[in-house]
């Protein structure tokens, strides 16, 4: 588990928050891989976006991919011609957001895949052990709303008037960020 033991790392409420969304070849961290990433770097107290990142990642084990997952994310080898290696994406993120707190809709998925990828590439953790899960904030907000029958990104966006193009990480993460801003800031 990543931990900041260095006393020079920023205090919790001063750390940058990296809103992050991955698309995967499936949801099993032991068999599947990250193939697309979008991230928004924000800084407290108002969580202004100071930088962003987007990349397609070269899949190396398509034989173990879940075909349904590939359909959902729109995987097409022609669209991945400019994809970068996993290691490069990890280095890019670590340079973009050192000492950050990860945030996302259900950010535990990204957390699990990110830890596995960093370990596989023998790279250090660049993020804190704390997570900001926007789904949990939405749950607290909508828990008594009789119109919210299923709490997911699409329904939450509709309820809050946020636009989203599902399973496109750049759209998903911007929508997640907008939901966060509307519920917290």
Language model region names:
Residues 144-162:
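A polyampholytic, Gly/Pro-enriched intrinsically disordered region
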Residues 2-112, 153, 158-159, 167:
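Conserved non-catalytic scaffold segment of RNase H-like nuclease domains
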């Amino acid at each position: 588990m990543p931990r900041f033991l260095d006393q020079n790392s920023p205090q919790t409420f001063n750390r940058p928050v990296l809103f992050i969304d991955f698309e995967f070849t499936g949801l099993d961290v032991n068999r599947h891989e990250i193939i697309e990433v979008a991230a928004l770097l924000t800084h407290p107290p108002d969580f202004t976006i100071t930088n962003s990142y987007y990349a397609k990642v070269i899949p190396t084990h398509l034989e173990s991919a879940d075909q349904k997952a590939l359909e959902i994310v729109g995987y097409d080898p022609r669209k991945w011609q400019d994809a970068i290696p996993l290691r490069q994406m990890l280095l890019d993120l670590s340079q973009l957001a050192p000492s950050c707190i990860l945030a996302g809709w259900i950010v535990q998925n990204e957390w699990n895949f990110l830890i596995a990828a960093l370990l596989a590439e023998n790279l250090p953790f660049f993020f804190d052990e704390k997570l900001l899960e926007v789904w949990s904030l939405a749950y607290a907000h909508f828990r008594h709303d009789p119109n919210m029958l299923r709490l997911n990104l699409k329904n939450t966006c509709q309820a809050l008037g946020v636009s989203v193009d599902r399973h496109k990480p750049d759209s998903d993460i911007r929508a997640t960020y907008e939901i966060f801003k509307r519920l917290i800031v």
